Amino acid sequence: MSQNFGKISQVIGAVIDVEFEPGKLPPIYQALRVTNPAIDDQEFNLVLEVAQHLGENAVRTIAMDSTDGLVRGQQVKDMGKQISVPVGKKTLGRILNVIGEPVDEMGPIGNEKEYGIHREAPAFVNQSTKVEAFTTGIKVVDLLAPYARGGKIGLFGGAGVGKTVLIMELINNIAKQHGGFSVFAGVGERTREGNDLWMEMKESGVLDKAALVYGQMNEPPGARARVALSALSIAEYFRDEEGQDVLLFVDNIFRFTQAGSEVSALLGRIPSAVGYQPTLATEMGELQERITSTNKGSITSVQAIYVPADDLTDPAPATAFAHLDATTVLSRQIAELGIYPAVDPLDSTSRILDPQVIGDEHYAIARQVQYVLQKYKDLQDIIAILGMDELSEEDKLVVARARKIQKFLSQPFHVAEAFTGSPGKYVELKDTIKGFSEIIAGKHDDLPEQAFYMVGTIEEAIEKAQKLAV
């Protein structure tokens, strides 16, 4: 097949119009390439993706890199396929960009296979209908807001409350306990944070179990709107071809929507509520529906969600909520108490916190833990004004147990060993349930609350109490 060439007719920011000969229009989502001397000296170094057919043998495309330096009349090459990214084990330990090129200066990927970034969601007949919990080894998550295998989890939290450390611990635990791989999509991230994550993953030894795909804040909107899809294709390969349970991290899903809204106006679409793109729900659906369990494997995704101006009704976070199975809310108040992971046990939710999925014992203990913590929260005003002495004996007991539970929800992480000096702990679900049921039953009312801080199992707490008593 002979090469198909067109030429640039118009450049509008990140959007480029290209004219082709009659009958040779490339289809929607096809990749085109053009030479941009402002990027580097390579020929055909800028990738464009066809977004619209304008009539008059012209297509409107979105650029995946800078368009500075392009001129009208320049030659554009039709690649004959959509944007494709390398897939397979060779991508592990590497950083790729939106078009699958390595950006870590460690040479070519050397992959055998590529996947297109736009793929169909798995057919109904291939989807797994089994609902089961996905054990993370993190007590507060497994007990109170368990993740579903193949589910979608929203991770909410401001700056500096430990989102990245939690993400790294999950990558570490899935690699060591499940032997699984992780894919990290940095969507509209700060470049510094992306670099920090890479360095920290290298130091904590989890880098060779993860593939990283970055489209940072300084990238044009085309790259930021597509980088999540590139990462998803890499994850789909591990699920479908290798039968893996994959973890997909997206940080930040809001930036995916934001990039879509930047491009949307340039494409000539009339904006909808709050200036977002009219195709907001469709774009989100196309991404989220591909994240699921099939009869071969699963993709479980953890998505950090930025909430603009703390307004949960904003169309961007509101659209993301519709797809979530669980939410993990990180709280600054809890971080200030020195309790890490700073997960809010009363604010975090899960669709599978249900006796039919997790069993009656787990459900009962989780609800009792939440009841005790809520009671303590209600009593805090009285304690602040009148002091502990004014409480009834029953309330004093509730407060004592709640404080022990609060401390016991903390846990040393493997990836933070260098900072905390204490070895990380992976806690099995049965040990988590046993520990909390014993605290609630009052078996450890005689132990000091400090014994429960930063330990794994209840046995470790008892051991720590004996050391403190010496």
Swiss-Prot record:
It is a peripheral membrane protein. GO terms for cellular component: plasma membrane; proton-transporting ATP synthase complex. Disulfide bonds: none annotated. InterPro entries: AAA+_ATPase, ATP-synt_VA_C, ATP_synth_F1_bsu, ATPase_a/bsu_AS, ATPase_alpha/beta_chains, ATPase_F1/V1/A1_a/bsu_N, ATPase_F1/V1/A1_a/bsu_N_sf, ATPase_F1/V1/A1_a/bsu_nucl-bd. Its main location: membrane. NCBIfam families: atpD. Produces ATP from ADP in the presence of a proton gradient across the membrane. The catalytic sites are hosted primarily by the beta subunits. F-type ATPases have 2 components, CF(1) - the catalytic core - and CF(0) - the membrane proton channel. CF(1) has five subunits: alpha(3), beta(3), gamma(1), delta(1), epsilon(1). CF(0) has three main subunits: a(1), b(2) and c(9-12). The alpha and beta chains form an alternating ring which encloses part of the gamma chain. CF(1) is attached to CF(0) by a central stalk formed by the gamma and epsilon chains, while a peripheral stalk is formed by the delta and b chains. This is ATP synthase subunit beta.
